[in-house]
Amino acid sequence: MAPRAAAIRQTCCCFNVRIATTALAIYHVIMSVLLFIEHSVEVAHGKASCKFSKTGYLRIAELVSSFLLITMLFIISLSLLVGVVKNREKYLLPFLSLQIMDFLLCLLTLMGSYIELPAYLKFASRSSRRVSPSKVPLMTLQLLDFCLSILTLCSSYMEVPTYLNFKSMNHMNYLPSQDGMTHNQFIKIMIIFSIAFITVLILKVYMFKCVWRCYRLMKCTNSAEERSGSKMLQKVVLPSYEEAVSLPYKVPEGGPAPPPYSEV
């Protein structure tokens, strides 16, 4: 057990994988609860995206699917937490699958944004000629919006309710707007945006590595305990002298009884 467990490192970048995975699970459970509350408040006040659906059954389908998606994400996060606490490595597999899907989605979003960037710049340059120079409040709002987008991307879910909103699937929504900015300012912001997005991708890879290493560690530990438990011989407590004397004699089947004990 010790050699195989020692072969798998219990740390990942100076952090214990169990502690890091537990913190990650608690964070995602809290995020799921907050997302559920936020979406419920939006639906109650009529601010959700489903209010644009004129058809009744489409509105109901969007509501039900959104709440089901958030509920499934909560179950996956809770499964990760239970798996780490109770040392059940199989409970970590759904979250690993979710992280792979989320990383691929972020990567495709970044690639799609840069593929559509030339057309976006051409369109923005035409519209910016009619716009007056920007003021400080506009830049402040753009900076706050950019920081909010980065914080949203730091979550493992990106924007959970917008998975089912096809209007938000435009890749250019993640890029900073060029309204009221010069070309050089926009290039600088794009460089900062790219560095921040790549940093988020590296963070997602690190989270996946922590959970994967924790999964391997728990699997190796559990398999070693099962092997050691199967090799242990069953110990039987021997009876005392009085119990042994009171036990009935065993007569072999088909054979004569043993002769009685007699003193010589």
Curated annotation (Swiss-Prot):
Family label: Belongs to the LAPTM4/LAPTM5 transporter family.
Transmembrane segment boundaries: 19-39, 64-84, 92-112, 136-156, 186-206
Keyword annotations: Lysosome, Membrane, Phosphoprotein, Transmembrane, Transmembrane helix, Transport
Taxonomic superkingdom: Eukaryota
Assigned GO CC terms: lysosomal membrane
Subunit structure: Binds to ubiquitin.
NCBIfam families per record: mtp
Protein name: Lysosomal-associated transmembrane protein 5
Residues modified to Phosphotyrosine: 261
Function: May have a special functional role during embryogenesis and in adult hematopoietic cells.
InterPro entries to which the protein is assigned, alphabetical: LAPTM4/5, LAPTM_4A/5, LAPTM_transporter
Compartments where located: Lysosome membrane
Topological relation to the membrane, as annotated: Multi-pass membrane protein
PANTHER family reported in the protein's UniProt record: LYSOSOMAL-ASSOCIATED TRANSMEMBRANE PROTEIN, LYSOSOMAL-ASSOCIATED TRANSMEMBRANE PROTEIN 5
Aminoacyl-tRNA synthetase keyword on record: no
